[in-house]
Regions:
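Short aromatic-glycine-(Arg/Gly/Cys) micro-motifs in beta-strand/loop hairpins
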Residues: 31-56, 79
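A short, exposed loop/beta-hairpin motif centered on an aromatic-Gly-Thr core
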Residues: 48-65, 73
Length: 94
């Protein structure tokens, strides 16, 4: 099984990591902007477009909580995807 990797989004003003499955960006984990200090400061998003029209995500108190939630969502999403879904994303990238 292909391992998930993360790469820092250098264009983001806040800490943000793009998550990759092979060469396909399947989501992100990053600090939220414009939220009060007492609110969850992190967010995660799992899914990609085109190819996968099912995007899930949510807030998290810490990076580790966001990562755990992302990984759980990915484990549910991955079995529903085909190689054609990943190829659709590659085609729009290239």
């Amino acid at each position: 099984m292909t391992e998930l990797t993360r790469r820092r989004d250098k264009e983001s003003a806040r800490e943000k990591w793009n998550i990759f499955y092979g060469d396909v960006c399947i989501g992100s984990i990053g600090q939220r902007a414009g939220v009060p200090n007492h609110a969850d400061q992190w967010e995660w998003k799992c899914g990609f477009h085109p190819g996968c029209d099912r995007l899930t995500g949510g807030p998290a108190e810490t990076f580790e909580q966001a990562r755990t939630a992302f990984e759980a969502a990915w484990q549910l999403l991955l079995p529903t995807l085909t190689e054609a879904d990943f190829q659709a994303w590659r085609d729009q990238r290239d």
